[in-house]
């Protein structure tokens, strides 16, 4: 068991003005002049609808409801209307509304990463928690990929830039994404949305809210269904179309207000995705290098590479093994080559529930948030991205990541000394169980590819020295050259090449890793 201990408490005095922030002016009144050191963004479409008595924009980014103009942090508030106008359905679309935020995913959609001001945690290791924290309705989501699901009707999204560890803990060193969904209402209402687009894209979304007991109990339910054909076409295997969408989401809420000072909000949600992701196309098949970028290693491949050889030894090897490069150099052809019998598949389920109690005790406000969540993402992939069988993850259910998380947060917020001191003190506890299952394997042509790659590295791009069908990928000329070039060591090297070429279809049927962590 791995235990991680974290203890924190804070008492904060609120400064008079913000040191740095993004101020979004009101849609109904002229924007006030920003305080010294602040910047202004004139973006009425992004005004949050939760406004205070003076028509100020009210946010909860500091664990309390405050006017945006008084918050001493750099924060952007994006309203539900702005999200709808932009077509945003999940947090990836926030890139266009919060320029300092970058969200991306590679390999599969469970490997999402978030960066704010260029800083974040990048990698597909499920043990890595993002340095850009994600909160949905006050509940911490330990992996950014959990936010890539449909989110239903939202009230607003807050993007906090810079370290937020004082209020949000160790996993907010780069920033924070705070998502607030639409609450139940004591007035009957609803929304519906239908969208159709190319690749047979269909999105149906709707919600309904209203009272169950007048002024005491209200409910809300939101649901979304999305389906789209894949936009990559497999021309060699049996995978059909890749990178499609097939997902649905449902969330139910209850809002209970037994007295004017007590509010209890209960939320339960479930989402499911079953999609074929993520195939990739080739940008170029030419061999490139930049000898000036690394003088100690001539020919080292770099970002600003230049074409030094119209041929490519790896491409030549793959071609000799039967690989097909659909319209090389044209990534917009959207044609991919998948090994026959292999597939891309991702299945994700994410569900959980939370309860938030807000109790006004007079001079002090008590907030308690209790939550439990389960998340599982798994699938299969042709991990070499070619129709040559080099490596893969089998479609047998033995490749997945699963998280079970319980969190409890308690906060007290109040004022002292005739409102001269505004304080916030609280505690946080979490327990998480992580299980990672892997089944990565070498394919049936791995040995031939690996040995040919070594031969090409030692002797250069000359195809006359290679024979993928021969032991060690050595043609008669290549074997003679190897034996002659390395003298007494030649026979041992040749034997090693021969053994390497026999490593095929080996790997893990199931490798299981478990981790338990406890934080408070």
Regions found by a protein language model. Give the residues of each.
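Outer-membrane beta-barrel translocator/receptor signature
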Residues: 112, 129-131, 143, 152-161, ...
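Periplasmic-side early beta-strands and strand-to-turn transitions of outer-membrane beta-barrels
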Residues: 178, 185-187, 195, 209-308, ...
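A surface-exposed, glycine/aromatic-enriched loop/edge motif typical of exported proteins
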Residues: 264, 268-324, 433-492
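Structural signature of outer-membrane beta-barrel domains
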Residues: 14, 64-66, 110, 121, ...
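Acidic, small-polar-rich N-terminal luminal/periplasmic segments of exported/outer-membrane proteins
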Residues: 53-187
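Extracellular/periplasm-exposed beta-strand and loop segments of Gram-negative cell-envelope proteins
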Residues: 195-197, 232-234, 239-243, 279-285, ...
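N-terminal Sec signal peptide and the immediately downstream disordered periplasmic leader
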Residues: 1-86, 93-96, 260-261, 353
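Outer-membrane beta-barrel transmembrane strands
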Residues: 144, 246-251, 255-261, 267-269, ...
């Amino acid at each position: 068991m791995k235990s991680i201990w974290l203890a924190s408490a804070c008492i904060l005095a609120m400064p008079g003005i913000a040191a740095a922030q993004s101020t979004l002016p009101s849609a109904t009144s002229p924007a006030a002049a920003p305080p010294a050191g602040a910047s202004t963004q004139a973006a009425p479409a992004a005004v949050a609808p939760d406004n205070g008595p003076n028509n100020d924009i009210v946010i909860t980014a500091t664990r309390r409801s405050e006017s945006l103009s008084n918050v001493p942090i750099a924060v952007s508030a994006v309203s539900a209307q702005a999200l709808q106008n932009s077509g945003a359905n999940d947090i990836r679309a926030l890139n266009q509304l919060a320029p300092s935020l970058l969200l991306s995913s590679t390999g599969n959609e469970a490997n999402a990463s978030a960066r704010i001001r260029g800083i974040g945690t990048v990698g597909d290791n499920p043990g890595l928690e993002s340095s850009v924290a994600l909160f949905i309705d006050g509940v911490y989501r330990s992996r950014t990929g959990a936010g890539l699901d449909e989110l239903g009707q939202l009230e607003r999204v807050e993007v906090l830039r810079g370290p937020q560890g004082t209020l949000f803990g160790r996993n907010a060193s780069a920033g924070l994404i705070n998502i607030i969904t639409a609450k139940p209402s004591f007035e009957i209402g609803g929304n519906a949305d239908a969208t159709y687009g190319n690749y047979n894209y269909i999105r149906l979304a709707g919600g309904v809210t209203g009272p169950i007991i007048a002024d005491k109990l209200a409910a809300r339910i939101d649901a979304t269904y999305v389906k789209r054909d894949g936009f990559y076409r497999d021309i060699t295997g049996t995978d059909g179309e890749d990178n499609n969408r097939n997902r649905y989401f449902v969330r139910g809420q209850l809002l209970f207000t037994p007295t004017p000072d007590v509010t209890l909000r209960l939320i339960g949600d479930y989402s499911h995705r079953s999609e074929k992701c993520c195939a990739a196309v080739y940008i170029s098949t030419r061999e490139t290098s930049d000898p000036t970028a690394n003088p100690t290693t001539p020919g080292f491949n770099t970002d600003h590479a230049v074409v030094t050889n119209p041929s490519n030894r790896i491409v030549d090897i793959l071609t000799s093994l039967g690989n097909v490069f659909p319209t090389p150099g044209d990534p917009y052809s959207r044609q991919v080559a998948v090994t026959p019998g292999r597939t891309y598949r991702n299945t994700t389920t994410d569900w959980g529930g939370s309860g938030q109690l807000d109790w006004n005790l007079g001079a002090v406000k008590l907030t308690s948030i209790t939550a439990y969540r389960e998340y599982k993402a798994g699938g299969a992939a042709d991990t070499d991205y070619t129709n040559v069988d080099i490596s893969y993850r089998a479609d047998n259910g033995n490749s997945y990541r699963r998280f079970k998380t319980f969190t409890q947060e308690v906060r007290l917020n109040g004022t002292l000394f005739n409102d001269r001191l505004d304080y916030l003190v609280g505690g946080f506890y979490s327990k998480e169980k992580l299980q990672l299952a892997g089944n990565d394997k070498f394919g049936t042509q791995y040995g031939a590819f690996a040995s040919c790659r070594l031969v090409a590295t030692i002797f250069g791009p000359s195809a006359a020295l290679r024979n993928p069908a021969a032991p060690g990928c050595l043609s008669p000329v290549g074997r003679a050259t190897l034996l002659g070039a390395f003298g007494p060591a030649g026979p041992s090297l040749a034997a090693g090449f021969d053994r390497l070429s026999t490593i095929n279809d080996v790997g893990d049927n199931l490798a299981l890793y478990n981790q338990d962590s406890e934080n408070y």
